[in-house]
Amino acid sequence: MSRENATEEKTTKPDPIYRNRLISMLVNRILRNGKKSLAHRILYGAMSSTRRDTGKNPLLILRQAMIKVTPDVVVKAKRIGGSTYQVPLEVGSMQGKALAIRWLLTASRKRSGRNMASKLGYELIDAAKDNGTAVRRKEETHKMAEANRAFAHFR
């Protein structure tokens, strides 16, 4: 193993309109087939629809949604002595944000609606109100971790 310094954590550049790193992380996760301008259009459309529907700052709603969806613990399958255990593990802040973004996007993709921008907007509003598919996913993960708390020493 190298004795050099540990590699620096990659940071994303803030987006041009809101000047926020969280939004650029979201854009990079929305991205499909290298079409970044389309990803920007989808996210900015979602932000404008949240502003229109709630009358509040969409960045504030996004932050609230991220707080409500970000998990504290996850379960990871670990094979010990021929049987597989679901071992609960704590999640770091960056990994938690990445999971929250992924869950928000998968929930909004599965949602019925006209276009991705409106579906993402409604999912953000629901998550900020503490309901919605992404929040349910976080609660299921926490329940699973609580149920398998006995295996926490297998880390």
UniProtKB/Swiss-Prot annotation:
Q: Does the keyword rRNA-binding apply?
A: yes
Q: Which GO terms describe its molecular function?
A: rRNA binding; structural constituent of ribosome
GO BP: translation
Q: Which Pfam family, just one, is annotated for this protein?
A: Ribosomal_S7
Gene3D superfamilies in UniProt? Ribosomal protein S7 domain
Q: Which InterPro entries has this protein been placed in?
A: Ribosomal_uS7 (IPR000235), Ribosomal_uS7_bac/org-type (IPR005717), Ribosomal_uS7_CS (IPR020606), Ribosomal_uS7_dom (IPR023798), Ribosomal_uS7_dom_sf (IPR036823)
Return the CDD domains for the record. uS7_Chloroplast
Q: Does the keyword DNA damage apply?
A: no
Question: Where does this protein chiefly localize?
Answer: plastid
Q: Which family does it belong to?
A: Belongs to the universal ribosomal protein uS7 family.
Its function? One of the primary rRNA binding proteins, it binds directly to 16S rRNA where it nucleates assembly of the head domain of the 30S subunit.
Complex and partners: Part of the 30S ribosomal subunit.
Protein name as catalogued: Small ribosomal subunit protein uS7c
The organism of origin for this protein: Aneura mirabilis
Q: Which gene encodes it?
A: rps7
